[in-house]
Amino acid sequence: MKVIIPLAGKGTRLRPHTHVVPKPMLKVAGRPVMSYVMDDVLKLGNVEQVVYITGHLKEKVEAYAKATYPIPSVFVEQAVQDGTAGAVALAKPYIDAPVLIIFVDTIFDADLSIVKDSTDDGIIWTKEVEDYQRFGVVVTDENGHMTKIVEKPKTPISKRANIGLYYIRNWQLLLEGIAHVLTTAPNKGEWYLTDAFQYMIDKGAKIKVVDVEGWYDAGQLETLLDTNRVMLEKGRARKPAQLGEGATIVEPVYIEDGCTIEHATVGPNVSLGAGSVVKHSTMRDTVAGEKVTITNSTLHDCFLGDSVVVEGVKGRMTIGDHSEIRGDA
């Protein structure tokens, strides 16, 4: 089996952090988002090769993947952002077996091992949502096979959202579908992989729909903090190495080595990077990078990059790397 991981996007909804860090490498609960997905891939044990479709800050993604995951891999640049079908099309030279396609700006609770015994042409994983208008949604028949997939419907034809996780056993028909889609007029400059799946269905393919237990978005600032909270609650809590006088920790938290906390309350739902200092402050529901210094502040719902200095500030904020903000506490 081959694995395709498209991660060429610029992460505009996560700026300023994605100016310097690729979206899949932003951390929640002390780990890069893509690491949660790759853990599931490693557990499968029958992966022949991973094809990373790279783009923005591609060198950082490539260096991280090579250093962290001992799987045969290739890296293909998507120089033009022409959509998800365009991204997967770049992997064509390497597709000669069933493929698992994973978009890594979300974290999911799914048993990927079911692909080993699947006899369907493919599997698509979904999650029932109320705000269906934001997603591609899937319609099924009475046997649980997909009959239609529609991007961001205006009418409630389904509430089963496509989460960006697919297994395609009939890889030949997938490539045929992508080739067909690329001959059609693009939608605002992009071709969608979901249209290739619809092509497969129209040609008689059986694509099974499987619901996931949990689906956590890390693709925008508003949801990344909530995903951090969920991952901490699911057992990622880690206590700091150095607790100073007057320090209070409210679980769950993930505080890396070398942090100093004095006369401060940290938590709940805080991830604090290595070497950070928190003094005379309170912080909750916050993701902070490495070597962050927070003094005389009251912070909540913040996303702070590396080497950020916050002094005398109250409230919520998003601050990129190597920035300082000071005010009256």
Give residue ranges: language-model regions.
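Short internal beta-strands
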Residues: 51-55, 126, 287, 303
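A structural signal for short hydrophobic beta-strand segments in well-ordered beta-sheet cores
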Residues: 25, 138-140, 209
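Left-handed beta-helix
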Residues: 180-329
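Active-site metal-binding loops of divalent metal-dependent hydrolases
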Residues: 10, 105-106
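Conserved beta-strand segments of alpha/beta enzyme cores
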Residues: 24, 72-74, 145, 206-208
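Conserved N-terminal catalytic core of the sugar/cofactor nucleotidyltransferase
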Residues: 2-5, 13, 26-27, 31-103, ...
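Conserved core of the sugar-phosphate nucleotidyltransferase
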Residues: 108-183
